[in-house]
Amino acid sequence: MATEIDINRIQKDIFIEHKGEPYRVLDYEHVKPGKGQAFVRVKAKNMLTGNVTELTFKASDRIPLADFEQVYATYSYNDGENYYFMNTQTYDMIAVPKEKIEEEAKFLKEGMEVIVFLYKGQPIGIELPKHVELQVVETEPAFKGDTQAGGTKPAKLETGAVIQVPFFVKEGDIVKVDTRTGSYVERVKEAK
């Protein structure tokens, strides 16, 4: 039997099981209506299908935690269908289907350390580091007058991802990106 927790102790990024399927909690809200019973609204990602859904639980409910295994691994390569990661403990290769990590794949770089999630022995997703440093390979040059506060332009990164960056960023710069939001954090190194 899986470990259960009181719904009032729910937190972001924990894994729960609902109707026999694993979910990752993305956000939650305790709701206390003027009339009626309090409840908890949970925004969660189904780790098997990738769908994000809203679940509602009574404040008195207990929910089972999903039985996940977390494996520390290093990204090696992809063959178009799967992304391959090397388990840093056993050196075994783990193949994760591309549809399981479409969002995360935009920021994957060879040699990057990640966590691979296994559910009943099957890989169902990964967790990237919170921030990654990637090189800008394509962006429009800055022009005189492009100095308005908060102005941004699109930039293509070495992994193929396109993000919005400030006007002063140019090709060859190394930028720090927040992998959770896909947004620019700062310029780490300026191109020479």
From Swiss-Prot:
Q: Where in the cell is it found?
A: Cytoplasm
List the residue ranges forming a coiled coil, or say none: none
UniProt keyword list: Cytoplasm, Elongation factor, Protein biosynthesis
Please give an example of a GO cellular component term from this record. cytoplasm
**Pfam family for this entry, one:** EFP_N
Superkingdom field: Bacteria
An example of a Gene Ontology BP annotation on this entry?
peptide biosynthetic process
Pathway noted in the entry: Protein biosynthesis; polypeptide chain elongation
Q: Which SMART domains match?
A: EFP (SM01185), Elong-fact-P_C (SM00841)
Q: Which residues cross the membrane?
A: none
Q: Decide whether keyword Cytoplasm is in the record.
A: yes
Q: Which InterPro entries match?
A: Elong-fact-P_C, NA-bd_OB-fold, Rib_uL2_dom2, Transl_elong_fac_P/YeiP, Transl_elong_KOW-like, Transl_elong_P/YeiP_cen, Transl_elong_P/YeiP_CS, Transl_elongation_fac_P
GO: which molecular function terms?
Answer: translation elongation factor activity
Any idea what job this protein has?
Involved in peptide bond synthesis. Stimulates efficient translation and peptide-bond synthesis on native or reconstituted 70S ribosomes in vitro. Probably functions indirectly by altering the affinity of the ribosome for aminoacyl-tRNA, thus increasing their reactivity as acceptors for peptidyl transferase.
HAMAP family per record: EF_P
Q: Family per UniProt?
A: Belongs to the elongation factor P family.
Q: Give the protein's recorded name.
A: Elongation factor P
